[in-house]
Amino acid sequence: NWLQNTPKYVVSLLKAWWGENAKSENDFDFAHLPKLGRGFQGQGYAFLALTHAMLAGEIKGLFCFGQNPVVGGANARLIRAAMDKLDWLVVADLFEHETAGFWKRPGIDPARIPTEVFVLPACSGVEKEGSIVNSGRWVQWRNQAVKPIADSRPDLDIVDGLAKAMKRTYEKDGVFPDPIRQLAWDYGDHADPHRVARELNGSFVVDVTEKDGKEFAAGKQVPAFAQLRDDGSTMSGNWIYCGG
């Protein structure tokens, strides 16, 4: 019953996200996690339920990174109608595609669509370094072949910039600022994919001696997910990749 190890993975994840702020006395900041409940009309927030939630006005904004749901989704007409109800839409991709331009489709008056659309220029896979995973179950590390053109940036840089801006904003004010303000977000001035990969794998937070006498110094990477712990002495952004 491998599920008995869930506390080890959850605590290690919380330590990765909130670092020194995640302590045993505050349940490792478990309360910082958003609670989705049963989702939209009890259907969760899978793709179709997410679309209906936008259509109903429950979801006000949407980020689309490297995807084109207006073309790739199951019901293009429904998806476009749902996006008509958004306050804002952020698309990060190589070019303006059908999702980014949903508001100027034939037969529609753009002036009647209130959605504010932001198109962020992401660079291509050969213009950045980092790992990829996909539905074909690939896990690859790719090196940068050429520099990004014009103002395009790796999507990691885009997310990093957004996160840092949010942290600065929540330092000043907010109804419930701690989950953002206390984030352990330090991947360098320009986000380093190696730091992200190291966090995903995980490391020991303090010096640890295991039952068999093996010693691991604080900062050393955890060699396998079976060695993650639920006492706050390890951190791992994704236990599946631990030791990979």
Model-derived features with residue positions:
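Non-catalytic alpha/beta scaffold blocks inside enzyme catalytic domains
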Residues: 1-201
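Long, low-complexity segments enriched in small/aliphatic residues
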Residues: 1, 186-244
